[in-house]
């Protein structure tokens, strides 16, 4: 079962709205608070966004990167989670946050980035969270 945004999109935008207990604006914390998803070790790898037909993934669905063991990564190759808005052949439109950014904002994550690009910045590495 995919996790979906529980708030209107306009209400998630802004500085510091989704902080963890240490005051950090991590991507996974945004997903947990905005969708009621469990903690990352429980996340399951669903449909690959880049292989989905337009309309197969509903706007507001939680997506994330997963490693070769089908888990949310803990290695140095990058990890990220976001809210899916839409996608084209070029990339995924998302709402996301991370510590350095400090707020939820829309962003385009392109597909098929060069080898060595962090998973966080390659749309080809994102899957629906189940």
Where is each model-derived feature located?
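Short beta-strand-centered aromatic/proline hotspots
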Residues: 74-87
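Secondary-structure boundary/capping motif
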Residues: 59, 80, 103-107
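Secreted/periplasmic proteins that engage bacterial cell-wall peptidoglycan
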Residues: 1-77
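Aromatic- and glycine-rich peptidoglycan recognition patches
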Residues: 3-17, 85-130
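Generic hydrophobic secondary-structure signal
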Residues: 30, 63, 81-84, 94
